[in-house]
């Protein structure tokens, strides 16, 4: 079987494993939590905010906190599908290049993160619109720059590739959840507290 066909098969198998795990639940809950926060935060105030501020607030929460934590949990779940049943020996004995095993997992994780970004955009728009409908005084003002918002989320997604690579390597390297979770939580903490520092730009 040609290598492209083998990789497609490995990718399909990995996607099937994801559907049977909690990864899809995580992919739905993380963006939903941000949308719920945006919704109730808008209802809490008495003054309308521009669309740009509302959308940038959603993107900031996603980039600084929810995305790193989601990637940490997602990569741990993906790795646990093999670590749990101790299936690595069987997988590595299969007649296909080993890089297919790892690349298919990376592609699936990136695909889920991309889907989460799209879902975040949709839910944020619905949350802001719904808050304005329930409380007209806080209805977002100004132009709704959806293209700019999607571009921002796309740039955040591209910047997250390094984060995915690091977290997935750690999750695959160690059978325990602890190292991957420790690095993910620690990295998120330092990225948040070092936002205003010069070193903050070096933290994925």
Segments and roles (model prediction):
Residues 14, 18, 92, 165-175, ...:
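Generic transmembrane alpha-helix motif of multi-pass integral membrane proteins
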Residues 1-28:
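Aromatic- and glycine-rich beta-strand/loop motifs that create alpha-glucan
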Residues 92-98:
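Short helix-to-coil transition segments within interhelical loops
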Residues 32-71, 75, 103, 107-174:
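Secretory targeting signals
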Residues 27-31, 105-106, 184-185:
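Residue-level recognition of transmembrane alpha-helices
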